[in-house]
Amino acid sequence: MKKLFFFTCLLAAVQYNSAQVTFTPQSAGTNYTDRGFVDMNGDGLDDILSVSNSNIQVLYQQQDGSFVESIVSTTFADISPSWSLAAADYDRNGQTDLLYGGGNGVTFMRANDDGTQYTEISGTEYVFSQRSNFVDINNDGHLDAYVCHDVEPSVFYINDGEGNLEYFQGGLGDYPSGGHYGSVWLDFDNDRDIDMFIAKCGGESERRDNEMHVNNGDGTFTESGASLNLEDDMQTWSSAWADYDNDGDLDGWVGASTFNSGFHRLMRNNGNGTFTDVINASGLTGFNVTSIENQTYDFDNHGNADIVSGGVILYGNGDLTFTISSTNIGNGGFGDINEDGFVDAISNGQLIINNTNNNNWLKINTIGVESNIDGIGARIEITTASGTQLREVRSGEGFRNMSTLNTHFGLGLDQEIESVTIYWPSGIIDVFDDLEINTTHSIVEGQSALNTGEFLTSDLSVFPVPALNNLTVSNIQDIEDPVYTVFDVSGRKVMQGRLLNNNIDVSQLTSGQYILRISGQKFRRNNVKATKFTKR
């Protein structure tokens, strides 16, 4: 291994929180196809990743700003990541594994316990890969994988808990001739389970109808694009989802790859199970760039989510309007490659270094215990004097590259954080007060010692007891927009969803004792109740 130092020229910092930022390009020092930024060794720092069929090059970021280079020769991969790459620690050994999505199939590169060797695992199935993701599809605490298929129904790989992945096709993106291009996993309906949007492309209109697969909370999904007003037959390869108006739910930017079938879409989440296209009021009707790459970060740390589409930054104003910048940072992966709290990029062998400003920031590195070790699927909300922001942990955004698994928040000129709330996929909720700003915090699931038993109350009523098929809940009129979570006696989450008409279908539960927790969509300690119940 060799130690490398990268230097860049910093511009003078600005004094106000709405300033756009500039960027300085420099060599990335990569030898192969650069595929993004991701923490490869579990130290919380983003590293530079470059791969070929027979080599994996990692430039490990150090605390002093230098990089230690490692090049590992691998068994020749049957499939190269010619279409996409995803990364995560799917076998929970502390080292990041890779998924190569190619034109003929899928290869997994499984890291050993110190990242010095990789085991090449390639299936025999034909997959014309597009976007790929690591995600816990069945929420059993183990990361699965998903790959969009261009010409057939999409495929996924279920983790058996020992790091072995079983291939499945169909059920999540089923159009017979495919057209599945850009998958992103998100919780759009605030019921605390993970849904999936697929940006689609194709010759005939039906093949390119965008899809939203809604998690039913029981391991199944229902494609609901039409009822949500998201089934659009524009040509698109990827989308970018964030809370662009800071109202507590995720909105969607669906970027057009060509204008032959329609313009860009900016879909406002109405909070009632529908979306409305607000592109005409967004300030983006003059944005005539088309691209296959769309992602979202807060590049200037002003506290609002921005969009990067085709390399052009669209600065968010926090109200679903945007300012088109003259900055183009290329299509690639994103992360903080010099630990200064500002988002950088990698594209075509160059690091695109953010020259920063005076705004403050916070980063969270999630470490799952009951949930998957990377915390993928977790939602993080922070509250400051300026309001509440939310982010989600995702593996595989945009179309082709891999970006950081750390969640990044710009704070503007706010000097304090009132609270940080992490909703883990397991159902565990961590709440922290007064975390230090301008710092990366590595948070272990359950670290805040906030658990379900703490909230057992005498004023939450359920009947009948024992319950057979349905459980009715009462005395929750003080909880706004209630969400229910059911845990078994070991503390494992077994059900979750929005509470509708004070009724929960428990027919699928096995007989035994359970804990029911009711909380508001915006979690507060004084806004949660829990009780035990019996299923017969």
Language model region names:
Residues M1-V21, T452, Q513, N527-A530:
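Bacterial Sec-dependent N-terminal signal peptides
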Residues S18-S50, Q63-G65, G94-T96, G141-L143:
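An edge-strand/N-cap motif at the start of beta-rich repeat modules
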Residues A19-T33, Y60-P81, M109-V127, I158-G178, ...:
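Blade-edge motifs of beta-propeller repeat domains
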Residues F23-S27, F322-T457:
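Gly/Ser/Thr/Pro-enriched helix-cap/hinge segments flanking short amphipathic alpha-helices
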Residues N31-G42, W83-R92, S129-N139, H180-N190, ...:
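Beta-propeller blade termini
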Residues G42-D46, G94-L98, G141-V147, R192-I198, ...:
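Glycine-aliphatic tripeptides that mark coil-to-beta-strand junctions in extracellular
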Residues N55, G105, E152, G202-S205, ...:
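Short glycine/acidic-enriched loop and turn motifs that connect beta-strands
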Residues A385-L390, Q415, T421-Y423, E454-R536:
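C-terminal outer-membrane/trafficking sorting elements
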